[in-house]
């Protein structure tokens, strides 16, 4: 079922490039909610969604790392706008791998935002959608989590955990009327990777959003972006470890 026109679409991480691009593609005829820190500064993002055809755009304060606020936020969104049709988890951080290797607090901060906070919010959202008997969840994993590399193992391990959790949650939701889409993009050329040398098969936020929107409409469970990464990682998983540990980012 495509709920995007029938119930609110909520973008958690409404200031992210991928989240913003995906929101524009889901906006036509929909009630949109952008949730992010400093929500009073989302005027430009809200205007873009109105221009894309949203019938209403709301903003909500959201700090992904404030786990205690997740449940009340989801409950208040349902109370104000009705059952959530589509929830997109577009927040996350890359962090500094070199720093994280010696700074435990920084390593934990990366894992907290990219895994723990996602698990918390997904659990609250899944419970609310189960109650409603419908809804769609969109989770952004990464190929960095398919086989974790030495070059970015802190971020990669968080994404590996998220991918596993989301896969299990999708199975748990089977038959409930709630579906979950896992997007697995490769290197994304954007603000978060500014200054870094793009990896092979890199993509833009626009391309990630377009592929994710198509997969959502078509009822897919997983989408690799670009698709060629899927067979590539089938092969990469077979590389001996002594070769794999020398792989660049």
UniProtKB/Swiss-Prot annotation:
Keywords: Oxidoreductase. GO terms for molecular function: oxidoreductase activity. Its EC number is 1.-.-.-. The keyword Transmembrane does not apply. Substrate binds at residue 142. InterPro entries: NAD(P)-bd_dom_sf (IPR036291), Sc_DH/Rdtase_CS (IPR020904), SDR_fam (IPR002347). SUPFAM superfamilies: NAD(P)-binding Rossmann-fold domains. The keyword Acyltransferase does not apply. The active site is at 155 (proton acceptor). PANTHER family: 5-KETO-D-GLUCONATE 5-REDUCTASE, DECAPRENYLPHOSPHORYL-2-KETO-BETA-D-ERYTHRO-PENTOSE REDUCTASE. This is Uncharacterized oxidoreductase Rv2073c. It comes from Mycobacterium tuberculosis (strain ATCC 25618 / H37Rv).
